Amino acid sequence: MAETDEPAFEDLHPIGTIGKIVRVLEMPDQTTTVIIQGMKRLELKNITETHPYLKGEVNIVEEEIPSKDDKEFQALVETCKDLTIRYIKSSDTLHQESAFAIKNLTNHMFLVDFICTNLPLKKDEKIELLRIDSLRERTYRLLEILN
């Protein structure tokens, strides 16, 4: 998708997230970092206003979440977790605090989405992961990318 100052519907990704600002940090280099927690995935149906900013009509995209008793899914998540921690530990560019956060996340959906968001994946891979409705399938695809 082309970058433009005046995007039309066709210039936007149809799937996105609604997020909650968790923290705003003023960094030593005079930049601002914002930590956002994704709440729900949304599908953009159409643009309803363009000025002074874009507004649109959206639908919430429901997640297909495996049951808590699903042992295969639990093993899949643990494998992704282990691979991600190994990747972070071998990286010179990723913060080691991320490994600590990943070790301590117990909610499978938050864990998978945290990994998808925070690893330096290609933009197309992140968009592909965001578009997958099934948490199980998203986790399988993440595992393929990690390998």
Predicted regions and their residues:
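N-terminal low-complexity, acidic/polar interaction/targeting segments
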Residues: 1-147
